[in-house]
Design a protein with these regions (language model features):
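Hydrophobic alpha-helical segments, especially transmembrane helices
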Residues: 8-10, 183, 242
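Catalytic grooves of carbohydrate-active enzymes
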Residues: 233-269
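Non-transmembrane alpha-helical segments in soluble domains
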Residues: 105, 167, 229, 252-255
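Short acidic donor-binding/metal-coordinating loop in glycosyltransferase active sites
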Residues: 92-94, 242-243
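N-terminal pre-catalytic segment of deacetylase/amide-hydrolase enzymes
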Residues: 2-91, 97-105, 110, 126, ...
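Metal-dependent polysaccharide deacetylase catalytic core of the NodB/CE4 family, i.e.
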Residues: 85-88, 98-100, 109-239
Length: 273
């Protein structure tokens, strides 16, 4: 009696079709290091998410929202550091110059603190000397996109243009390679996180921010100082706006008080230490 082998081999053309099907749902990019990055941004959700946190005043890490935090981390982003280390990562959003950045830079220099400045194309074009000073003092320059548009409202090509045109300008004018990005308005989606990561960028959100951005309605200095100090916590990524007079006037005091409380200020480049 002849035994028939029931095993069926998949023909080579079948394997090829399967591979093509997988790649059809994905996009391959070359990141800044020249490495191929495979993403499935074509099928990712584009539901717009506004970053938010639930603060406390007992110096514990705030609630970032488990779902949003997980989504951010799955796509290489960060919002808060090690809960066991009293580190603070100071960041500034600089869409335009209001006349306070020279004082901010001086306070950082006097207190030996390195910060990250997220800037737009407008800022580079109007304040090249300040950008140069930031770099010379050892601060990090982050990408806040060309035109500060909400990223989920943009298609893939528009996102690449908003991010990489600014990247190219920094390379050409300052020989500087940016690698951190903060989404304008704190708005993002699963799709935009994947697409910015594919461009070689790490998305940086925050674990503390407050209403400091309105120049015409600046917070009271005493209340602002108390709020900032009450919310200090391990691994904090602090977001301040560079157009705030209150922040500028308080910066030196905040740094000194935080150090007295046992906190150390770290650069984003030291995030994993």
């Amino acid at each position: 009696m002849k035994v028939v082998d029931q095993k069926r081999k998949i023909p080579y053309w079948g394997i090829a079709i399967l591979v093509l099907a997988i790649f059809s749902l994905s996009v391959v990019y070359m990141n800044q290091e020249g490495e191929a990055v495979l993403t499935n941004s074509g099928t990712a959700s584009n539901e717009k998410i506004g970053w938010g946190i639930k603060r406390n005043d007992n110096h514990e890490q705030p609630d970032l929202g488990k779902k949003n935090q997980t989504l951010l981390e799955q796509n290489g982003g960060i919002a808060m550091g090690n809960k066991e280390k009293k580190y603070i990562y100071l960041t500034f959003d600089e869409g335009y110059e209001a006349g306070y950045t020279p004082q901010i830079l001086e306070a950082l220099k006097q207190n030996e603190v390195k910060a990250t400045f997220f800037i737009t194309a407008h800022y580079i074009n109007t304040e090249p000397e300040l950008v140069k000073q930031m770099i010379e003092q050892g601060h990090i320059i982050g990408n806040h996109t060309v035109n500060h548009k909400s990223m989920p409202d943009l298609n893939k090509q528009e996102i690449e243009s908003e991010v990489m045109k600014l990247h190219q300008v920094m390379q050409e004018k300052f020989q500087y390679e940016m690698k951190y990005l903060r989404p304008p308005k704190g708005e993002y989606s699963e799709r935009t996180l994947q697409e910015t990561q594919s461009l070689g960028y790490k998305t940086v959100m925050w674990s503390f921010a407050y209403q400091d951005w309105d120049e015409k309605n600046q917070p009271d200095k005493t209340k602002a100082k108390q709020k900032i100090l009450d919310n200090l916590h391990p691994g904090e990524i602090m977001l301040l706006h560079g157009n705030s007079k209150t922040n500028t006037d308080l910066l030196g005091e905040i740094i000194q008080e935080a150090k007295k409380m046992g906190y150390e200020f770290k650069s984003l480049d030291e995030f994993n230490e």
